[in-house]
Curated annotation (Swiss-Prot):
Quaternary structure annotation from Swiss-Prot or TrEMBL: The system is composed of three essential subunits: KdpA, KdpB and KdpC.
Enzyme class: translocase
Keyword field: ATP-binding, Cell inner membrane, Cell membrane, Ion transport, Magnesium, Membrane, Metal-binding, Nucleotide-binding, Phosphoprotein, Potassium, Potassium transport, Translocase, Transmembrane, Transmembrane helix, Transport
Main location: membrane
Recorded catalytic activity of this chain's protein: K(+)(out) + ATP + H2O = K(+)(in) + ADP + phosphate + H(+)
Catalytic residues identified in the record: D307 (4-aspartylphosphate intermediate)
Organism (species): Leptospira interrogans serogroup Icterohaemorrhagiae serovar Lai (strain 56601)
Protein name: Potassium-transporting ATPase ATP-binding subunit
InterPro entries found in the cross-reference section: ATPase_P-typ_cyto_dom_N, ATPase_P-typ_P_site, ATPase_P-typ_TM_dom_sf, ATPase_P-typ_transduc_dom_A_sf, HAD-like_sf, HAD_sf, P-type_ATPase_bsu_IA, P_typ_ATPase
Length: 692
C-alpha cells in the first residue's frame, strides 16, 4: 500500500508555501525557534550594517552578500515548515468540503421534522435513508445500511453499518447508499469526528512533542555555547595580533557569519517540518494521530495488544451448526436457539436466527405477540435469553451464553453439563470456534458453533513486527482453547484468554511498569479503558464512538495490520530527526575546521603565511571567500534536505545496532565530508566569477 503522491510538491501547495514563507518572518513566529531566531537577528544586524555603511558612502559587496545569504537561510527554514504544513492543509481543505449544511430528518415523537444538521444535539434521533448524508456522528439504534465513507477515508468501496456489535458507529458527512437506519447523535456540532480530523491535520495547531522540546533545548544550549565562543574571538584575535605585530580583521558581519555557520541551523530549520510531515505521512496512510507524541511512541513500542474480534478476526462470528444434547432433536434446539436470539441485535444473534431459518425453515416470530421478555446480555452473567409468558406468568425460561457462564448457571440449579457435551465444547474450541450453550429451564439443550474468520495476510504482517522486535499479544474473552487455536492461526506471539476490560487494563499497566511501551488496537466500547491507558491506542474507524474517543490514533481503513506502517512512520520520524541532528552537528565540526584556519592562517606569520595556515587544508581563496562560501553552503543545505525531512529516511526492519552504525556512517561521516567538498566548490565558483 502506497498513497504517496507522485508529485512531491503540487503547484497550489507550492504557491501557498512561498507566501507563508514570508509571513513567517514575523519576529513573534521566529522567536519560537531559538536557533533560527539567532540567524534572523544576525540577518537584521548585517543588513543594518550594510545600509549604514552605504549611507556614509561605503559600499561593501561582501556585507551585502552575507546579508542576503543569511536571509536566504531564514527563508529556506520557513519554506521547509510551510511546505510540510501545506501538504497537511491540502487534506484539511478536502475535509472541509465534506462539512456542508446538511438537512437532518429529526424524529420528534412519531413525526419527522427537517432541521439543519448544525442544530442537532447529543441524544437527538434522526432517520437516514438511501441517498441521505448522515448529519452528525452517531450510533445506529435500528437497521442496517450500506454507507459511502469515501469523503472521510478516501476508499470508494462502501461499508456496512448496523445496529448492535462494533459496527454501529457512523460519521457525519458520509452518505447512506441503501436501506434505512435510525441514528442517535453522539457528538455536538464542532466536536464531531470530522471536526476533530480537521483540527488534527492543520499543521499550524500542531503542538511540539516532549522530544522536540528537549532537542530544541539542546540545540539552544549548543548555540549559546557557540555564541560565547564567537564573542570571545575578537579578544583572542586582538591579543594574538598585538603579540605578532599584526592587526586582527574580524568585522561584525564575519563574526555573525561564523556564529551562524557553527550553530546547528540545519536541524533547527528542519525540525518542525520533520514533526509535521510525520503526521502528514500518517494521513496519507489514512491514519489520524491526535498528537505527535503518539507517533513518536509508535516508533518505540515493545508490545502490541490486539483485540481479537474485529481486529484479528472479521468481527462477525457466524452460527455454523447446532449440536443437540442426547435425547434432544436438532430442530427443537434450533427453534429454541432462534427464540433466544429474536431480539438480539448483534451480528451473532442474527446469524443464529438465519441459520435456524435456512436449515429447518423456522420462520421468525414476534416476541411481543408471544408475551416474550428479552433478557439482554449482561457483563456480570455473560448470558442473554428470553422469558416467555402466558397470562403474565413465565412459562418458559430460555438462556444462551458461553460455556463457563452456563456451567455456573446450571450449577445453581443443581445440574451439570454431560461428558458428551463437554467433549463437543472442547472440540469446537480447539478448532478456533466459539461454543454457545442453550438451556431451557434447568435443561441443557445443546451447543451452537460460532465461527470466527481470521483476516487474511495477518501472519506475514505479524512476522514483520517480530523482526522489528515487537511482541504481539491477542486479547479475547474466549476460553483458552478457542484463543489458542485462533492465536496459532493468526500467528501472534501470545494470547490472553477470558479477558475483561479490567484484565486488559491490568495487563497494560503491568507491562508499562516493567518499562515497556505498549500499543493497543481495538474497536469496541470494552476496549476504551485499555486504549486510553496504552502509549499508542489505535482505534478502528468502524468501531464504536467510545473507542474512537479513547484512542490517540484512528485508522480510517480499520485495518489492524496497518500498525506496521504506523510503527515504520514512527521509527522514520525518530530516525530522520536523529540522522539530521547528527548530520547538522557533523556539519558544524567540518565548517569549524574550514573557516577558522582561513580566518587565522596569517597569525604568527614571518612572511605572508603563518604556521596556522597548515590547518587550512582546503586552501580557500581568502578570508572573505571562506566565510561567504561557508554561509552559502549553510543556507543551501536546508532546501537540499527538505525532501528527506518530508519523506523520512528509508527504514528497514534491521537490528538497532546495524541501523545505528549505518546512519552514523551515512549522516555522521557524510556530514563531515560533504561540507569540505561543498565549501571548496563554492569557493572556486566565487573565485571564477570574481564575486570576492
Amino acid at each position: 500500500m502506497n498513497r504517496e503522491s507522485k508529485v512531491f510538491i503540487e503547484s497550489p501547495i507550492l504557491k501557498e508555501a512561498i507566501l507563508n514563507t514570508f509571513k513567517k518572518l514575523h519576529p513573534f513566529l521566529q522567536a519560537k525557534n531559538p536557533v533560527m531566531f539567532i540567524v534572523f537577528l544576525g540577518a537584521l544586524f548585517t543588513t543594518w550594517i550594510f545600509f549604514k555603511d552605504l549611507y556614509y558612502g561605503v559600499y561593501s559587496s561582501f556585507n551585502l552578500q552575507i546579508s542576503l545569504w543569511l536571509w536566504f537561510t531564514v527563508l529556506f527554514a520557513n519554506f521547509a515548515e510551510a511546505i510540510a504544513e501545506g501538504r497537511g492543509k491540502a487534506r484539511t481543505d478536502s475535509l472541509k468540503k465534506t462539512r456542508s449544511n446538511i438537512i437532518a430528518k429529526k424524529l420528534v415523537g412519531n413525526k419527522i421534522e427537517n432541521v439543519p444538521g448544525t442544530l442537532l444535539k447529543i441524544g437527538d434521533i434522526v432517520i437516514c435513508e438511501a441517498g441521505d448524508l448522515i448529519p452528525g456522528d452517531g450510533e445506529i439504534l435500528e437497521g442496517i445500511a450500506s454507507v459511502d465513507e469515501s469523503a472521510i477515508t478516501g476508499e470508494s468501496a462502501p461499508v456496512v453499518r448496523e445496529s448492535g456489535g462494533d459496527r454501529s458507529a457512523v460519521t457525519g458527512g458520509t452518505k447512506v447508499l441503501s436501506d434505512r437506519i435510525k441514528i442517535s447523535i453522539t457528538a455536538e456540532q464542532g466536536r464531531t469526528f470530522l471536526d476533530q480530523m480537521i483540527a488534527l491535520v492543520e499543521g499550524a495547531k500542531r503542538q511540539k512533542t516532549p522530544n522536540e522540546i528537549a532537542l530544541t533545548m539542546l540545540l539552544s544550549g549548543l548555540s549559546f555555547i557557540f555564541l560565547i565562543a564567537v564573542m570571545s574571538l575578537p579578544l583572542f584575535a586582538e591579543f594574538v595580533a598585538k603579540e605578532g605585530g599584526q592587526s586582527a580583521n574580524l568585522s561584525i558581519p564575519i563574526l555573525i557569519s561564523l556564529l551562524v555557520c557553527l550553530i546547528p541551523t540545519t536541524i533547527a530549520g528542519l525540525l518542525s517540518a520533520i514533526g509535521i510531515s510525520g503526521m502528514e505521512r500518517l494521513i496519507r496512510f489514512n491514519v489520524i494521530s491526535k498528537s505527535g507524541r503518539a507517533i513518536e511512541a509508535a516508533g518505540d513500542i515493545d508490545i502490541l495488544l490486539l483485540d481479537k474480534t474485529g481486529t484479528i478476526t472479521l468481527g462477525n462470528r457466524e452460527a455454523r451448526d447446532f449440536y443437540p444434547a442426547k435425547g434432544v432433536d436438532e430442530k427443537y434446539l434450533a427453534d429454541v436457539a432462534q427464540l433466544s436470539s429474536l431480539a438480539d441485535e448483534t451480528p451473532e444473534g442474527r446469524s443464529i436466527v438465519i441459520l435456524a431459518k435456512d436449515k429447518f425453515g423456522i420462520r421468525e416470530r414476534n416476541l411481543s405477540e408471544m408475551e416474550g421478555e428479552f433478557i439482554p446480555f449482561s457483563a456480570s452473567t455473560k448470558m442473554s435469553g428470553v422469558n416467555l409468558k402466558k397470562e403474565g406468568k413465565v412459562v418458559r425460561k430460555i438462556r444462551k451464553g458461553a460455556g463457563d457462564s452456563i456451567r455456573n448457571y446450571l450449577h445453581t440449579l443443581g445440574q451439570k453439563i454431560s461428558a458428551e457435551l463437554e467433549e463437543t465444547i472442547q472440540t469446537i474450541s480447539q478448532r478456533g470456534s466459539t461454543p454457545i450453550l442453550i438451556t431451557e429451564e434447568d435443561r441443557l439443550l445443546g451447543v451452537i458453533e460460532l465461527k470466527d474468520i481470521v483476516k487474511g495476510g495477518l501472519k506475514e504482517r505479524f512476522a514483520s513486527l517480530r523482526k522489528m522486535g515487537i511482541r504481539t499479544v491477542m486479547i479475547t474473552g474466549d476460553n483458552p482453547l478457542t484463543a489458542a487455536a485462533i492465536a496459532a492461526e493468526a500467528g501472534v506471539d501470545d494470547f490472553l484468554a477470558e479477558a475483561t476490560p479490567e484484565t486488559k487494563l491490568k495487563k497494560i499497566r503491568e507491562q508499562q511498569a516493567k518499562g515497556y511501551l505498549v500499543a493497543m488496537i481495538g474497536d469496541g466500547t470494552n476496549d476504551a479503558p485499555a486504549l486510553a491507558q496504552s502509549d499508542v491506542g489505535v482505534a478502528m474507524n468502524t468501531g464504536t464512538q467510545t473507542a474512537r474517543e479513547a484512542g490517540n490514533m484512528i485508522d480510517l481503513d480499520s485495518n489492524p495490520s496497518k500498525l506496521i506502517e504506523i510503527v515504520e512512520i514512527g521509527k522514520q520520524l525518530l530516525m530522520t530527526r536523529g540522522a539530521l541532528t547528527t548530520f547538522s552537528i557533523a556539519n558544524d565540526v567540518a565548517k569549524y575546521f574550514a573557516i577558522l584556519p582561513a580566518l587565522f592562517g596569517s597569525f604568527y606569520a614571518v612572511s605572508e603565511v603563518g604556521p596556522l595556515s597548515a590547518l587550512n587544508l582546503m586552501k580557500l581563496g581568502s578570508q572573505k571567500s571562506a566565510v561567504l562560501s561557508a554561509v552559502i553552503f549553510n543556507a543551501l543545505v536546508i532546501p537540499a534536505l527538505i525532501p528527506l525531512a518530508l519523506r523520512g529516511i528509508v527504514y528497514k526492519p534491521l537490528g538497532a545496532d546495524r541501523i545505528l552504525k549505518r546512519n552514523l556512517l551515512i549522516f555522521g561521516l557524510g556530514g563531515m565530508v560533504i561540507p569540505f567538498l561543498g565549501i571548496k566548490c563554492i569557493d572556486l565558483m566565487l573565485g571564477f566569477l570574481g564575486i570576492i
